[in-house]
Amino acid sequence: QGLYTAIIAGFFISFFGGSRVQIGGPTAAFVVIIYGIVEQYGTDGLIVATILAGIILVIMGICRFGSLIKYIPYTITTGFTCGIAVTLFVGQLKDFFGLEIASVPSEFLNKVIAYVQNISTINLTSTIIGVVAIIIMLFWPKVTDKIPGSLIAIIITTAIVYFAKLPVNTIGSVYGELNSAFPTFHAPALSMKLVQEMISPAFTIAILAGIESLLSAVVSDGMIGDTHKSNAELIGQGLGNIFSGLFGGIPATGANA
């Protein structure tokens, strides 16, 4: 579902959004919200909430709510960016160290506790491969900046694992064979009761998506010396989430690559 969201929502957010360099797709900030909605209302509930959130975001953009971004203190922007970085960093530790955990908690502190409790399952081979990848990414720019170091790291470490037949998890071993078919239109099973129940989660998704995308756009502005269009960004986010939901995707927002 995340891949479908990156394709569908990513296209609409990039095409209609107001930032030249910001990408769109599912982000770590939505994990807790998505988990709660699916647990209580199922996949159809999440799809309805995503579509409603998209409609709310479009309305916010039309009403020019994006202009309010200028009143947000810069310290919030900095803290927000650091928070995302820490969340993503901690989220990758399980796979980096090859820890064997049946179910990883979605909450930050519980996730850290689970890592500590299962530290004895560390896979040294997986850790070494991860370290090699980091070293390549750090030092490759000294060789050339025409090819991204991350791409070179993926190619080299994948080749090492494949030819040496190292005992580490791969995308195939963890997720199985990926569906190569393009996502199809999916109309959720609607009922007035479900729509009413999804209004509150939809507002939560819309507000979080709006704030995250606009703050990320501000960060992107600082990187390239440009100014984004806040209201257009909200409309793009809204359209991205509407179509993401219609094709069975999950909530999406703008983010820094």
Regions found by a protein language model. Name each.
Residues 1-257:
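Transmembrane helical cores of multi-pass ion-transport proteins
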